[in-house]
Amino acid sequence: MAKQTWKPGNMLYPLPAVMVSVTDGEGNDNIITVAWAGTVCTNPPMVSISVRPTRFSYDMICKTKEFVLNLTTEELAYATDYCGVRSGREVDKFQELHLTKEKADHVKAPMIGEAPVN
């Protein structure tokens, strides 16, 4: 078989959707759903996510250089979908979805209390 060149894209399926919580450090927090997330290193712990520059959360991440990955459950399916299709420019997703902000140990971005793993 001859080699093929494919356009950039996601070739590893399935990828879990994760909810990423962010802050701008000035009292504004947001949640974005991403499907492109992965482990980069375990020591020190590092993960990667892919966020388009046009997304509301992008500038927050660039400004603070931090975020929290929040794993989802079946119970969080609606919230996970909602956070992927609604912009934080228009709605406070924590308030709208009645999600609990919890203080993280090492970053300023809040954790989602309902997520089983942050």
Question: Whereabouts are the PLM-identified features?
Answer:
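Active-site-proximal mixed secondary-structure blocks
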Residues: 1-34, 38-118
